[in-house]
Amino acid sequence: MADTKVEIDLDYKGLEQCLEEIGRDFQGEGYGLDRLLERYRSFRKPGMGPAEGMEALIRSAAELTSKETPLWEFAAARLRYCGFACEVEEQLKGLGIKGLYEKISYLTEQGLYGDYILKHYSREEIEEAEGFLDDERNKLFTYAGLDLLLKRYVIQDHSHHPLETPQEMYLGISLHLAMKESKDCRMQWVRRFYDMLSRMQVTMATPTLSNARKPYHQLSSCFIDTVPDSLEGIYRSVDNFAQVSKFGGGMGLYFGKVRATGSRIRGFEGAAGGVIRWIKLVNDTAVAVDQLGMRQGAAAVYLDAWHKDLPEFLQLRTNNGDDRMKAHDIFPAVCFPDLFWKMAEENLDQDWHLMCPHEIRTVKGYCLEDCYGELWEERYLDCVGDDRISKRTVMLKDVVRLIIKSAVETGTPFIFNRDTVNRANPNSHRGIIYCSNLCTEI
């Protein structure tokens, strides 16, 4: 241990104790401070500053992680937290902040914390909550988990300097979640929420981890929108998605009502560009609205299995073909009726007819996507037999082949069995369920 202290000469408060604990807690073949020191020597360079040296030490521990010695990932996390804690302490010292109440007051003044926390809780209650904090629970983090949490979820000032520890983050979330409980038991709920989160008995979705306790406290993850077949409606849906993504939500967008490529616009034949061009707009919005750089937006786009643009839709994320018809950052999903699978089971060489929803609405006076089950099947076959409606006829096996090819290359499309979902819908009196969201991947 003496040699280690000399060779790892980094001016970080608590580092010596951290190394001693690593040496004590991680023993056995493949562990030990001598191994860490040996790897650190290979990374150390003359003239390294303290920050670079600490990063090299963390990297040394992280790269020792293997199938045979998995616990090095926890050792790396301890070193990562040691460096982070020093950075936070330095920031707070410069601001003259002592204690959790002063910290929350400062963060509220800076617009980094929601003022509702101080409105709901007294100083005494926040000081009581501060007593719940248990830094020993930081030892439960793996390096990858802690590194992600420190980069994305703890509160930073406007210059990206951290001002909150992971345990304070969990406590802040707990204060938010419990604030509407009755006063006589509210602090018990704060303690209960904090214990469950900090012991990693439960976890929260990204919007809750990121937004609870902050001014824009949007906690929901999943949203759904039906994209109308109009210019105004399409852009309104894209704007809705941008607003949802801005605060951490993901969205499922149903494009089954949008007219297909070559369809009429104001009576002019062949004017419509189809759904792919609009989906590219959603794709670019997901990339652009990246939640203050925290993470890229997420959208699943849904199209019916009978839509004329299905073949191009199934190739949205594949690596071959015209890149102008690609959308690599969204998650395509297909809404399948039972009829498709029944026909595929009977004979894959059968024809499957693709049609434009706008054309069906114009000719037949109803929206095929607005029904399911036997009524949908009856109307679909009626449309197939109507010569006034143009069809794009493909073989079932070609559709299945495109699905398999895309699934192998990209893991998509997600499969949404619309008849099964709508039969199970307890609120069918409120209308049809057109699609789901990103959760369809489960």
What is each of the regions a protein language model found here?
Residues 1-442:
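Extended catalytic cores of very large enzyme megasubunits
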